[in-house]
Amino acid sequence: MIKKLVSHLGEYKRAAVLTPLFAALEAVMDVLLPTIMAFIIDQGIEKGDMNAILKYGLLTFLVAVVALALGVLAGKYAAEASTGFAGNLRDAMYENIQHYSFSNIDKFSTAGLVTRMTTDVTNVQNAFQMIERMCVRAPVHLVFALFMGVMIGGPLSLIFVVAVVFLVAVLAGIMVPTFHIFDRVFKNYDALNASVQENVSAIRVVKSFVREGFENEKYTKACQSLYDQFVNAESRLSFNNPAMLTAVYGCNIALSWLGAKYVLHGAITTGQLNALFGYIMNILMALMMLSMAFVMISMSAASAKRIVEVLDETTDLPPAKQPVQQVKDGGIEFEHVTFKYKHGSGQPVLNDITFSIKPGETLGIIGGTGSAKSSLVQLIPRLYDAESGTVKVGGVDVRDYNLDVLRREVSMVLQKNVLFSGTILDNLRWGDENASEEECIRVAKLACADEFIERFPNKYNTWIEQGGSNVSGGQKQRLTIARALLRKPKVLILDDSTSAVDTATDAKIRKAFREEIPGTTKIIIAQRISSVQDADRILVLDNGKIDGLGTHEELLKTNAIYQEVYNSQTQGSGDFDKQGGEQ
């Protein structure tokens, strides 16, 4: 895990190497100060030698200045290395997430990925900075101070050893269980972020159903769970300071009592006893810094583990060994396809699906909620892979294509329309970033979006808020259809993408498709039969199985589900949910 993380230091390796070097040298300078002070007392003050006082006083000042300079440099390079390291981690995670399939995203959840890229990376950044400085400075302090203590005090140095053993035992008893608690803490962060994200993104629904109280209660429960875990962890960590103070006071009492006897018997000088007090504080401060570092490491270890999970996750859509670089045409074939979601119920949502679509043909797909209409079409641009069977586009298995090539030729308007902050032109050019304004206007007219765009004061330069919150549902759908058309794809998939559009506009869009893009294979998922009845063929899905396939007229004669829904819709307000099974 550590090797994986450190590999992302990149251009900040130099700063990461210089930081511990300067921190170690700073610690050495600090350790020299008590010995120099001992010379000032023994050679200067007790003997009344002003020259010795000035000489060793100047040396003390120079050592302190050098230590200060080294500390500043260590701090500068530590900040540079840790900040750059965190940036590289976020970049690497973000880049890897871009290659995830929908199944990979389902595994972590959106809120979980956000937590890992923000809170978890910040924890690792802080821990890395502390490791670079304290975890180098403190051990150097500890080793050199112990060495100097043994050199000066001899048997008195056993006091230091007892203190070190005591504190190491206490720290070990605290840290081991605390690590597991922090692992649960960050899982609770995921739940908290999910609650916030869901509430904010659906705030209009929350308010319209007067569910503020329920959402507040749900958020409070998530906060309380996080609070309880943190209190549990901090309660254990709270033993750290009392243990440290016990060691400090115990060492001071023991050293004062035994040290005074050694001075009276002439075994050590007053200056050396003073130096021993300085070294014992050095040792205990080093242990305190290490304990703080261990606390930070305990928190960040769980975060580091979660970050590595994201970095190690590989897409479950493996690339083809010899990828096909061109889609010949828009012909589509499903051959005995079965599919299930890896992180779902484990039951197949599509069962033994077999049918084909000719290039340029229009296929309508209808079925009840949970009949797997969206799941079916998501296999065409390879957003998921089939569990068994084969999906072909242009006569080639979709798994044999270069994924970018395939998706450039299969343009899909998802059921959940997404617009990004930027102008209307910016959003349309997601389909083709090099498209001219004239091309954008042309596809907007095909999608019947031009009529409302022209009513905006800034027309195509009108600013769209994040998520398209300042346009209506129907307007959003027409903009996303126009965006898909701008790619000039061989296959166009509309996943219930005209549900918020009135029937007259829906008819205009379908007419424009027939007249302007006859060579493009079109797949239209809809609840309204009027949206698909002009299609060359209509596929009826029921509980993940094909219940019927034919023209509008053929299905009216042969398919019971289609007949009943057609009759209910022509008589008023019928839909497929009355026939379609629940998934």
For each of these PLM feature ranges, what is it?
Residues L21-F22, M29-D42, V63-T110, V114, ...:
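Juxtamembrane helix-loop junctions of ABC transporter transmembrane domains
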Residues E11-R14, H99-S103, T119-E132, V136-V140, ...:
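An intracellular "coupling" helix at the cytosolic face of ABC transporter transmembrane type-1 domains
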Residues M1-E11, L113:
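A short amphipathic helical element positioned immediately N-terminal to and/or at the very start
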Residues D49-I53, F144, M148-V165, V176, ...:
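Helix-loop-helix
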Residues K47-G48, T83, D91-T115, T119-V121, ...:
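Short intracellular "coupling" helices and adjacent cytoplasmic loop segments at the cytosolic face
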Residues Q325-Q583:
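ABC-type nucleotide-binding domain
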Residues L21, L25, M29-L33, L58, ...:
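Hydrophobic alpha-helical transmembrane segments of ABC transporter permease domains
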Residues G10, A16-L73, Y77, V150-P155, ...:
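Transmembrane helix-loop-helix hairpins at lipid-water interfaces of multipass membrane proteins
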